[in-house]
Amino acid sequence: MKRDLYETLGVARNADEKELKSAFRKLAMQYHPDRNPGDQEAEKSFKEINQAYETLKDPQKRAAYDRYGHAAFEQGGMGAGFGNGFAGGSAGGTSRHFRRHLRRDDGRRSSAPLLGRSRTRCGPSLQHGDHPRGGLFRQDGADPRADVGHLRRLHGLGREAGHQPEDLRHLPGLRPYPRRPGLLLDRTHLPDLRRSRSDDHRSLQQMPWPGPGHRGAHAVGQYSDRHRGRHAYPPLRRGRTGLRGGPPGDLYIFLSVRPHEFYQRDGADLYCSVPISMTTATLGGKFDVTTLDGTKSRVTVPEGTQAGKQFRLKGKGMHGRALQPDGRPLYPDPDRDAAEAHQAPARIAAGVRADLVQGEQSAIDGLLLPHERFLRYTERIATPGFRLCPSP
């Protein structure tokens, strides 16, 4: 398989003329036959470098290569619009005939001529599991964030390891041109569909369909995967490269917030459950809640507070440009930890009150242990360097 011309020169696909010339001069001096007498490999590399530079420095040849790859310069290939393979025929008239028998890369019939005036197409949006053929590679309505699975093993080779590419020109849907006597089309042929586009991993790849067990039919589509990194927002024009020289698509990022061990989020509001003792719920008292910034806010519990009672701390919730300037509220929810659910009495006798105070101080019944664990947690998250959402 022929080597990618950009890879041969060691430049990016969007390299300008100055970068191409600089890379060519550097490699030409390195592999020049005069500097490597008798070295056949150096001579071969020198010829490849010259061929790559001669192709890419010409705007028309470069555009044809970007669209069709090496097939643009082969006899009867997609680049035959430059005059090869038609024996004086009109590329425009021939393209109208091609249009009736070929489909676009996304499975729909093309409204633009295939040769000569091929229109560009915006690249597909880079979503996990998204392909130009839509329902061909996944069921309609499926979550685009679902794993691609089998497609991960292809790595742009167009086939699984250990399997040779197959001749696909006889398959249904890949209709060759009708061979009618007297037509110039007899002198043309489809591009070699046996060739997997490993020379251009960024756009076209051949992938098995309908599944891992069927290696007979292939189709041209896009392959996407998950990537982790920092991205500017909004992430526009960061998708796959467009087909036939078109602009790149958009990049869509799906965000999911991992659950926190203490806070529960509902929009911009935060909720948390705070364990308190039966004595505090019955007699009243106070407890501290650690907020997102590590500071503590004291909540006063009135006498006779029942389980599930919500308290509101104004301005202690989420902050952001789209939220209120002082933040949204934080709702501590007292959760009395006891062996059995019970209600705190609204009124209590003086003697019982004294017994409860004594039990609060001694903690014989162990009801204070959950609250003590909560206090230790709040002290831990208030220490410098603690992160509420540690990196995975």
Swiss-Prot record:
PROSITE patterns: DNAJ_1 (PS00636), DNAJ_2 (PS50076)
Domain of life: Bacteria
Segments for region (Disordered): 103-142, 157-244
Listed GO CC annotations: cytoplasm
GO molecular function, one term: unfolded protein binding
Domain J: 2-71
Protein name: Protein NolC
Record organism: Rhizobium fredii (Sinorhizobium fredii)
Name of encoding gene: nolC
